[in-house]
Amino acid sequence: MEQFECITVEEAYQKLHQGAAVLVDIRDPQSYAMGHAPQAFHLTNDTLGAFMREHGFDTAVMVMCYHGNSSKGAAQYLLQQGYDAVYSIDGGFEAWHRRFPADVANGA
């Protein structure tokens, strides 16, 4: 994959529950703590190294932000780091929370 692909929250939910991809949330710590997808890894500048050690470049990665804009830059960055398949989630956490209100966790 030379460029990231934009996917819907429904597609992301399906990939996540099939084990076909991991989910990262790039929002600020306060927003993440107030609510995030339960399986989301909070990806920040400080946690990037740990994420990359834990997940090889053959891992498909889905990036979630607030509304689906910032995730595009982060998705491109992950591709440049060597990840084979990266997705940006359209609508971000706002769309996830609207579509899957029962699938939201709180806390860091």
UniProtKB/Swiss-Prot annotation:
Molecular-function GO terms, alphabetical: thiosulfate-cyanide sulfurtransferase activity
Keywords: Cytoplasm, Transferase
InterPro entries: GlpE_sulfurtransferase, Rhodanese-like_dom, Rhodanese-like_dom_sf, Thiosulf_sulfurTrfase
Residues the record marks as active site: C65
EC number: 2.8.1.1
Location of this chain's protein in the cell: Cytoplasm
Short name of one Pfam family: Rhodanese
All copies of domain Rhodanese, residue ranges: 17-105
GO cellular component: cytoplasm
Predominant cellular place of this UniProt entry's protein: cytoplasm
Catalytic reaction annotation: thiosulfate + hydrogen cyanide = thiocyanate + sulfite + 2 H(+); thiosulfate + [thioredoxin]-dithiol = [thioredoxin]-disulfide + hydrogen sulfide + sulfite + 2 H(+)
GO process terms (BP): glycerol metabolic process
Function: Transferase that catalyzes the transfer of sulfur from thiosulfate to thiophilic acceptors such as cyanide or dithiols. May function in a CysM-independent thiosulfate assimilation pathway by catalyzing the conversion of thiosulfate to sulfite, which can then be used for L-cysteine biosynthesis.
Family (UniProt): Belongs to the GlpE family.
Full protein name: Thiosulfate sulfurtransferase GlpE
Originating species: Salmonella typhimurium (strain LT2 / SGSC1412 / ATCC 700720)
Name of the gene: glpE
